[in-house]
């Protein structure tokens, strides 16, 4: 069954006001800017944004008044530093922020994907991240303490039940609470009409975010025939049965890069930073690049054909051919 929708219909039908949305999960590449801009155009409100280190899309949505809460490791412009709208929202407007790390964002999403209430970790021990943070609870390991080579402190590899000869381990851990987004939005290189998607490059926490979510929107550079997807099952990192809508949107991740399609637009990132220093600046930027364009095609026309061509990948680096015969 075809799940192909326009961006407008996908956002209108699957993202209500008040939803929690995971996006920008592939770190600095394949950020779904076109989807974020459609959320802004539709004036979605009271959203919770979920992500690891989160580039300027979060800041744009905050500046547009869409966001009530952020759950992330960092928000800003990775080229230029702190994000102006994010800082204003926190310092002046009291926007709620839950601070996680890249790894604990991954653990929280993976726990939800597995259907368990939490996953344990040692990485947050001693960190201020856990202070007054609803996503962390310090717990004691129910198993014997193990050293760096998988041996217990006595050198015995055999497991011991709590209360056994060596008693309960004194190892401290943090339980990281499961995080289930209402919607995960991802950008991929290609997909078929049923939502089966090929993606390559840096996955970040995309796979965890897709599997954890209640609903998934996959935005693709191009829609291809099912035979293309079936030809390389190892690249089908998003199966169609997890996807609620698939949207074809060339250049939909600009100004972030998409491997094999176009480069990162460093000039655009710098300009956005310089042009959003105040609320008035941000409003003018949004009027030009979001409200002033009806869709991604109009956005690309405003960007200009020469700029689009300049950003296209010129030096391709193809992977070796894989033989699935047996």
Features from the language model and the residues they span:
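Conserved alpha/beta enzyme-core scaffold
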Residues: 1-151, 164-326
């Amino acid at each position: 069954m075809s799940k192909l929708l326009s961006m407008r219909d996908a956002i209108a039908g699957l993202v209500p006001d008040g939803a929690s949305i995971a996006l920008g999960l592939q770190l600095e590449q394949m950020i779904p800017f076109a989807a974020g801009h459609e959320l802004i155009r539709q004036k979605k409100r009271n959203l919770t944004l979920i992500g690891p280190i989160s580039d300027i899309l979060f800041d744009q949505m905050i500046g547009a008044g869409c966001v009530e809460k952020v759950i992330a490791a960092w928000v800003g412009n990775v080229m230029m530093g702190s994000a102006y709208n994010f800082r204003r929202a926190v310092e002046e407007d009291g926007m709620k922020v839950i601070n996680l790390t890249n790894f604990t964002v991954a653990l929280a999403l993976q726990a939800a994907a597995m259907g368990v209430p939490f996953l344990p970790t040692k990485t947050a021990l001693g960190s201020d991240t856990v202070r007054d943070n609803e996503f962390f609870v310090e717990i004691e390991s129910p198993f014997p303490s193990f050293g760096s080579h998988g041996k217990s402190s006595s050198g015995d590899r055999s497991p011991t039940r709590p209360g056994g000869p060596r008693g309960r381990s004194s190892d401290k851990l943090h339980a990281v609470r499961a995080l289930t987004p209402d919607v995960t939005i991802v950008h991929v290189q290609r997909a078929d009409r049923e939502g089966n998607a090929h993606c390559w490059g840096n996955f970040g926490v995309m796979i965890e975010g897709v599997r954890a979510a209640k609903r998934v929107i996959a935005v693709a550079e191009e829609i291809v025939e099912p035979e293309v997807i079936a030809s390389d099952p190892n690249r089908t990192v998003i199966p169609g049965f997890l996807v609620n809508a698939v949207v074809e949107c060339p250049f939909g991740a600009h100004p972030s890069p998409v491997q094999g399609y176009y480069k990162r637009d460093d000039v655009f990132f710098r300009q956005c930073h310089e042009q959003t220093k105040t609320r008035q600046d941000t409003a003018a930027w949004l009027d030009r690049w979001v409200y002033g364009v009806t869709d991604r095609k109009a956005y690309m026309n405003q960007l200009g054909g020469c700029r689009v061509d300049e950003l296209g990948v010129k030096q391709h680096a193809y992977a070796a051919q894989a033989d699935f015969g047996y």
